[in-house]
Amino acid sequence: ALGSEIVKELRENLDWPYSEFEIPNEIYADWDASDIGQKYEDDWNEKVQTLKSENPEKAELLERLLNEKLPEKFDSNFSVFLEEILKHNEPIATRKASQKVLEFLKKNLPELIGGSADLSGSNNTNTSVSNPITSSQNGNYIYYGVREFGMNAIMNGISLHGGLIPYAGTFLVFMDYGRNAVRMAALMGIKVIFVYSHDSVALGEDGPTHQPIEHLTTLRSTPNMQTWRAASLLETAVAWKLSLIHISEPTRRTT
């Protein structure tokens, strides 16, 4: 600590006559951005009103997305879908089961933005209706490259923006590379779905470097995070549904 005498001398040298924790009105005025913010808000409200007039259907969709609500008939449609796929409940890897569920979800939820850290073919996070986002075209799927932390942090940003639900995958053992962003998602209580495949200690041909041991314990002990480890097509489908309807916590799924 500087000490009271040094602080007093510093105040005199800086010509700072204000008391402790006092902020002068001039500084408040210089930092006040309410006028600029009001302009942005007015512009946004005008665009929303224009959209409501010109395209009520899109305006209704926008309102639903920004309010983080699922479609009105989502529950009933999902139940029908579930009954149908369970008629052919063959034993398959849960990452493939996850892809089956995603095929339905992506066709019914335009707010889903998928991706993977260079493992789309292994995680099965892409679907027949996945359109890659590039610098020149819109889409609903991001090829993040080999950068797990960047991927997770970007998903956090997408979620914080609102209106979209991000999900993306990598191998469970690579969770460590993006761990801080996963923890931040839990800390902020935002809606992000982390998909981790190849979660068995004995799975894969790459040996112990790709076989997770402590990772499940780490994620399960993270406060404010749901962890689903599905073991069948039914459990995978239910895990996806509960991940989507839960608003205030990120979800981490293994497949």
Label each region the model flagged.
Residues 41-51, 176-187, 227-235:
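Short flexible/disordered coil segments
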Residues 113, 120-216, 238:
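Thiamine diphosphate
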Residues 1-34, 160-163, 187-243:
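Conserved thiamine diphosphate
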Residues 245-255:
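Single conserved hydrophobic/aromatic residue that forms the stacking wall/gate
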Residues 96-104, 177-181, 237-241:
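Short alpha-helical segments and helix-capping/turn motifs at coil-helix boundaries
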Residues 24, 71, 75, 223, ...:
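Proline-rich low-complexity regions
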Residues 1-147, 157:
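Conserved acidic/glycine
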